[in-house]
Regions:
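Positively charged, helix-rich recognition surfaces that bind polyanionic ligands
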Residues: 1-159
Length: 159
Protein backbone atom coordinates (compact mmCIF):
# COMPACT_ATOMS: atom_id res chain seq x y z
CA UNK A 1 0.00 0.00 0.00
CA UNK A 2 2.39 2.71 -1.21
CA UNK A 3 1.39 6.35 -1.25
CA UNK A 4 2.42 8.39 -4.28
CA UNK A 5 4.92 10.25 -2.09
CA UNK A 6 6.81 7.03 -1.31
CA UNK A 7 7.11 5.54 -4.79
CA UNK A 8 10.89 5.08 -4.44
CA UNK A 9 10.86 4.46 -0.70
CA UNK A 10 11.22 6.98 2.10
CA UNK A 11 13.58 8.40 4.68
CA UNK A 12 12.45 8.33 8.31
CA UNK A 13 14.10 10.19 11.17
CA UNK A 14 13.94 9.67 14.92
CA UNK A 15 15.01 12.84 16.73
CA UNK A 16 16.66 12.32 20.12
CA UNK A 17 18.28 14.60 22.69
CA UNK A 18 21.83 13.92 21.46
CA UNK A 19 21.39 12.69 17.87
CA UNK A 20 19.12 12.12 14.89
CA UNK A 21 18.77 8.54 13.68
CA UNK A 22 17.99 8.29 9.96
CA UNK A 23 16.68 5.20 8.19
CA UNK A 24 16.23 5.02 4.43
CA UNK A 25 14.12 2.29 2.86
CA UNK A 26 13.37 1.16 -0.67
CA UNK A 27 9.87 0.95 -2.17
CA UNK A 28 9.33 -2.44 -0.48
CA UNK A 29 10.05 -1.03 2.99
CA UNK A 30 13.47 -2.70 3.33
CA UNK A 31 16.40 -0.84 4.87
CA UNK A 32 18.86 0.63 2.38
CA UNK A 33 20.81 2.99 4.65
CA UNK A 34 21.07 3.99 8.30
CA UNK A 35 22.91 7.06 9.51
CA UNK A 36 23.45 8.90 12.79
CA UNK A 37 23.74 12.69 13.02
CA UNK A 38 25.14 13.78 16.41
CA UNK A 39 23.76 16.89 18.13
CA UNK A 40 26.27 18.62 20.40
CA UNK A 41 24.35 19.96 23.41
CA UNK A 42 27.41 21.65 24.91
CA UNK A 43 27.80 24.11 22.00
CA UNK A 44 26.79 27.73 22.38
CA UNK A 45 23.31 28.67 21.19
CA UNK A 46 24.62 30.14 17.92
CA UNK A 47 26.81 27.11 17.19
CA UNK A 48 23.93 24.78 17.99
CA UNK A 49 21.62 26.71 15.64
CA UNK A 50 24.23 26.55 12.88
CA UNK A 51 24.69 22.82 13.51
CA UNK A 52 20.92 22.21 13.31
CA UNK A 53 20.74 24.27 10.12
CA UNK A 54 23.51 22.15 8.54
CA UNK A 55 21.78 18.94 9.66
CA UNK A 56 18.52 20.14 8.10
CA UNK A 57 20.30 20.80 4.80
CA UNK A 58 22.02 17.41 4.87
CA UNK A 59 18.79 15.52 5.60
CA UNK A 60 16.88 17.45 2.92
CA UNK A 61 19.63 16.82 0.35
CA UNK A 62 19.55 13.12 1.21
CA UNK A 63 15.81 13.06 0.46
CA UNK A 64 16.03 15.20 -2.67
CA UNK A 65 18.91 13.29 -4.26
CA UNK A 66 17.10 9.98 -3.76
CA UNK A 67 13.65 11.37 -4.72
CA UNK A 68 12.23 10.18 -1.40
CA UNK A 69 9.82 11.75 1.08
CA UNK A 70 10.87 12.53 4.63
CA UNK A 71 8.81 10.87 7.37
CA UNK A 72 8.72 12.39 10.87
CA UNK A 73 6.73 11.94 14.06
CA UNK A 74 3.83 14.33 14.64
CA UNK A 75 4.53 15.08 18.31
CA UNK A 76 2.18 17.09 20.55
CA UNK A 77 4.28 19.38 22.74
CA UNK A 78 1.38 20.48 24.95
CA UNK A 79 0.95 16.90 26.18
CA UNK A 80 4.70 16.60 26.76
CA UNK A 81 4.79 19.79 28.84
CA UNK A 82 1.83 18.59 30.92
CA UNK A 83 3.64 15.32 31.68
CA UNK A 84 6.75 17.30 32.68
CA UNK A 85 4.96 18.40 35.86
CA UNK A 86 5.40 14.90 37.24
CA UNK A 87 9.03 14.24 36.30
CA UNK A 88 12.28 14.93 38.17
CA UNK A 89 13.80 18.41 37.74
CA UNK A 90 16.93 17.17 35.95
CA UNK A 91 14.88 15.24 33.39
CA UNK A 92 12.63 18.28 32.83
CA UNK A 93 15.68 20.47 32.20
CA UNK A 94 17.01 18.01 29.62
CA UNK A 95 13.62 17.84 27.88
CA UNK A 96 13.23 21.63 27.93
CA UNK A 97 16.62 22.19 26.33
CA UNK A 98 15.86 19.48 23.77
CA UNK A 99 15.50 21.26 20.46
CA UNK A 100 13.09 18.80 18.82
CA UNK A 101 10.69 21.47 17.63
CA UNK A 102 13.55 23.65 16.38
CA UNK A 103 15.15 20.76 14.51
CA UNK A 104 11.85 19.71 12.97
CA UNK A 105 11.00 23.27 11.87
CA UNK A 106 14.39 23.68 10.19
CA UNK A 107 14.13 20.34 8.39
CA UNK A 108 10.53 20.96 7.30
CA UNK A 109 11.37 24.46 6.05
CA UNK A 110 14.34 23.18 4.02
CA UNK A 111 12.20 20.38 2.57
CA UNK A 112 9.37 22.78 1.68
CA UNK A 113 11.79 25.18 -0.05
CA UNK A 114 13.25 22.29 -2.07
CA UNK A 115 9.99 20.50 -2.95
CA UNK A 116 10.61 17.47 -0.74
CA UNK A 117 7.44 15.96 0.74
CA UNK A 118 7.25 15.68 4.53
CA UNK A 119 4.91 13.02 5.90
CA UNK A 120 3.90 13.22 9.57
CA UNK A 121 2.92 10.02 11.36
CA UNK A 122 1.46 9.08 14.73
CA UNK A 123 4.37 8.77 17.18
CA UNK A 124 2.61 6.20 19.35
CA UNK A 125 4.94 3.37 20.39
CA UNK A 126 7.51 3.86 17.61
CA UNK A 127 10.43 3.19 19.95
CA UNK A 128 8.63 0.35 21.70
CA UNK A 129 7.73 -1.38 18.41
CA UNK A 130 11.23 -0.78 17.07
CA UNK A 131 12.77 -2.29 20.19
CA UNK A 132 10.46 -5.30 20.46
CA UNK A 133 10.12 -6.15 16.79
CA UNK A 134 13.29 -5.09 14.99
CA UNK A 135 16.34 -4.67 17.26
CA UNK A 136 17.18 -8.37 17.33
CA UNK A 137 16.11 -9.16 13.77
CA UNK A 138 17.94 -6.20 12.21
CA UNK A 139 20.76 -5.99 14.77
CA UNK A 140 20.30 -2.22 15.11
CA UNK A 141 19.90 0.21 18.01
CA UNK A 142 16.46 1.16 19.31
CA UNK A 143 16.79 4.60 17.70
CA UNK A 144 17.49 3.24 14.21
CA UNK A 145 14.62 0.80 14.64
CA UNK A 146 12.31 3.64 15.75
CA UNK A 147 13.31 5.58 12.61
CA UNK A 148 12.55 2.41 10.62
CA UNK A 149 9.07 2.12 12.19
CA UNK A 150 8.42 5.84 11.53
CA UNK A 151 9.55 5.35 7.94
CA UNK A 152 7.33 2.30 7.39
CA UNK A 153 4.29 4.09 8.87
CA UNK A 154 4.81 6.92 6.42
CA UNK A 155 4.83 4.40 3.59
CA UNK A 156 1.54 2.89 4.76
CA UNK A 157 2.90 -0.29 6.36
CA UNK A 158 1.44 -1.44 9.68
CA UNK A 159 3.80 -2.83 12.32
Amino acid sequence: MLTSDTLYGAIGIDINVDHIALCETNKDGNIVLIKKYPIHKENTKNKRNEELYQLAIEIMEQCKSKKKSLVVEDLNFKQLKTRMLYRPKKQNKTLSSFAYKKILEKVERKCLMNEVDVIKVDPKNTSKIGKEKYTKIKGLSVHYCAAYVINRRGMGFVD
